[in-house]
């Protein structure tokens, strides 16, 4: 059984170079502000991963998993052209500790 009150969110830059990295940073800030708004506890595990604890966190965030796209005029392009950037968001629940020696193998 999963713990619905704990989730780990990892965000990875996809295609888009500097714009994709900037998109990941924007998403991380957005999720951090969302956790503050909901009075959840958040802990940064590394540069692109957050552990969030609060009531029904996993239930509310699980649908955020997947590829997210941003289309904008790039601040990194001298020609001010429109660029598309992608990021991958992975939302995982906290799983209980288990002893692999006791797992039934069919």
For each feature predicted by the language model, list its residue ranges.
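A conserved glycine-rich
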Residues: 1-106
């Amino acid at each position: 059984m999963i713990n619905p009150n704990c989730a780990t969110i990892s965000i990875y830059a996809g295609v888009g170079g500097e714009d994709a990295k900037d998109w990941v940073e924007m998403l991380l800030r957005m999720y951090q502000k969302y956790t503050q708004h909901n009075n959840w506890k958040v802990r940064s595990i590394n540069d692109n991963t957050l552990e969030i604890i609060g009531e029904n966190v996993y239930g509310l965030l699980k649908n955020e998993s997947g590829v997210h796209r941003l289309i904008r005029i790039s601040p990194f392009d001298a020609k001010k052209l429109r660029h598309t950037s992608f990021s991958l968001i992975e939302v995982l629940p906290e799983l209980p500790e288990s002893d692999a020696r006791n797992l039934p193998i069919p």
